[in-house]
Amino acid sequence: MATASFDSAPGASRALPAIEKAPEVTALSTLPGRKASLVGLTREGLKQALIGIGVPERETRMRVSQIWHWLYVRGAREFSEMTNVGKGLKAQLAEHFTLDRPEVVTEQVSRDGTRKWLLRMAPTGAHDHNRGAEIECVYIPGDDRGTLCVSSQVGCTLTCSFCHTGTQRLVRNLSTAEIVSQLVVARDALGDFTGQMPGKDGGEVGRLVTNIVFMGMGEPLYNLDAVIDAIAVMSDQEGLALSRRRITVSTSGVVPQIERLGLEANAMLAISLHAVRDELRDELVPLNRKYPIAQLLEACRNYPGLSNARRITFEYVMLKGVNDSDADARALVRLLKGIPAKINLIPFNPWPGSKYECSDWERIERFSEFVFNAGYASPVRTPRGRDILAACGQLKSETEKLRARARMMLEEGMGAEAVYADQVD
């Protein structure tokens, strides 16, 4: 069953600065008559849910603490599991709410152990044809960590020319609960909640998911309210208990929101740079036409908490004959002078219809060596999950295809039900 969010739509509580207006797309309210899920809620959202069913406000702090533990430490799927919650309250909760997660439409496992989930969110009405928006998230296991790549939007507005997600139009922002629920789904699938596997004590030690990267579908800083609240839930030490130093938010360069991200989320920052000249970055990352490289790097220099211990990661996709020359490497080092940084070199991951090729391995190594010798860590990101289109730049949900088919059928006088009856998962 898909998750129905009780959280208010992103952007409802905190206005963006006038200089930067996010796209007018939000997570719409739950369908009438549908129970909302408590999974993914903030503490305040959970408090308001309890008040809404008649729990006295003086009791809410204790009740929120109890339920929070079952949601985010134990991973409860039924209210009956909540042994320290009174029978009457459990009955009330079951009457009004669920503990549903997003529906797992498909799970693919790569030869290298990477997992990709296609998740369907709760339906919100005509906006998504009563079916529910679809997004992807990816789990990447490593020797000393496990990284979950989460999405912040359904689709993307940025149309970066090398990115598969950029070929899918933006449908809407995800709510806080929909972002957090991606971590809940991953922990469910991996048996990563306390009590599900031996040695799980609620802390980071022994966890399979140790790191979160906002590098899935969408531009996180265009949905910053929801992202900040999601990070607060993920890093709450009485719940999901991730360290904020293990949460990284990647942006293509929404300059006016970068400082606020640092002040309110205190997360690690990654920049999708990919070029050292404005004319090339204008093509690769069209947002550069609004916020050129000089403005972006100035915002990076002023990022709250920036230090050698909290470096900014600059992502640089290696495109054959496009941005991979010795001159590009020298220019990159000059641009980043004075910024505590590391540079992630990303071998381009091909996807159907792309016009780019990955740089030769020898060229990538030469580029990396030049940057390293200039004093910057320059790891080459090992491509993971390429065989299931789960690697960097390859994510794309089925939503865009569904919307196109819906428009076509509606033009032919067919209802939305026909679209989904015809869709084979």
UniProtKB/Swiss-Prot annotation:
Its EC number is 2.1.1.192. The keyword tRNA processing applies. GO terms for biological process: rRNA base methylation; tRNA methylation. PROSITE patterns: RADICAL_SAM. It is an enzyme of class 2 (transferase). It is found in: Cytoplasm. It catalyses: adenosine(2503) in 23S rRNA + 2 reduced [2Fe-2S]-[ferredoxin] + 2 S-adenosyl-L-methionine = 2-methyladenosine(2503) in 23S rRNA + 5'-deoxyadenosine + L-methionine + 2 oxidized [2Fe-2S]-[ferredoxin] + S-adenosyl-L-homocysteine; adenosine(37) in tRNA + 2 reduced [2Fe-2S]-[ferredoxin] + 2 S-adenosyl-L-methionine = 2-methyladenosine(37) in tRNA + 5'-deoxyadenosine + L-methionine + 2 oxidized [2Fe-2S]-[ferredoxin] + S-adenosyl-L-homocysteine. GO terms for cellular component: cytoplasm. Pfam families: Radical_SAM, RlmN_N. Its cofactor is [4Fe-4S] cluster. GO terms for molecular function: 4 iron, 4 sulfur cluster binding; metal ion binding; rRNA (adenine(2503)-C2-)-methyltransferase activity; rRNA binding; tRNA (adenine(37)-C2)-methyltransferase activity; tRNA binding. [4Fe-4S] cluster binds at residues 156, 160, 163. Disulfide bonds join 149-392. SUPFAM superfamilies: Radical SAM enzymes. It comes from the Bacteria. The active site is at 136 (proton acceptor), 392 (s-methylcysteine intermediate). Its main location: cytoplasm. Binds 1 [4Fe-4S] cluster. The cluster is coordinated with 3 cysteines and an exchangeable S-adenosyl-L-methionine. Residues 142-389 form the Radical SAM core domain. Specifically methylates position 2 of adenine 2503 in 23S rRNA and position 2 of adenine 37 in tRNAs. m2A2503 modification seems to play a crucial role in the proofreading step occurring at the peptidyl transferase center and thus would serve to optimize ribosomal fidelity. Reaction proceeds by a ping-pong mechanism involving intermediate methylation of a conserved cysteine residue. Belongs to the radical SAM superfamily. RlmN family. This is Dual-specificity RNA methyltransferase RlmN. It comes from Methylorubrum populi (strain ATCC BAA-705 / NCIMB 13946 / BJ001) (Methylobacterium populi). The lineage of its organism: Bacteria, Pseudomonadati, Pseudomonadota, Alphaproteobacteria, Hyphomicrobiales.
